[in-house]
Amino acid sequence: SALPPLPEEATENTPEGAEAFIRYYVDVANLAHQTPQLGLVPQLASDVCESCVTMEQQVSDLVAKGERVEEPVYQIDKIEPIGGSTGGVQLFNMNVTLPANRILTAEGAEASSYEATEISGRGGAIWEGDRWWVYELTLTP
């Protein structure tokens, strides 16, 4: 599965680079749900990112059922860096909206729908091997 091009700013080992990478990850996560593709999320996930494993499982469920999500699943409302990074990890306070959405069958019929939800918490990226990886997204209602 081919990833969309990584924005130039997401290649920099700076807090701004980490933020650009997290935003890119959310774009890829949306793509993975709207045109269900396995293998996109793991290409960006660190070995310790449990939420990344959960997200790939959600995509796997869509693929298995032949379903897709109609609109982007995640929308970042706020992302603010927390202090300095330690051990190559840059953390952020995040607010994310999951807009009201529909899950569609392969034929385009509505399989299910859900109301909008706001989640918040921490996200983080870790710099390893000359690039960013998603460290963790711990976001809850």
Language-model segments: residues:
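Exposed beta-sheet edge and beta->alpha loop/turn motif
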Residues: G83-P141
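Generic alpha-helical secondary structure signal
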Residues: V28-A29, K78, R102
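A short, amphipathic edge element
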Residues: A64-P81
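A generic alpha-helix propensity feature with a strong bias for hydrophobic helices
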Residues: P7-A10, Q75, G84
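Core segments of small alpha/beta cavity-forming domains
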Residues: S1-E67
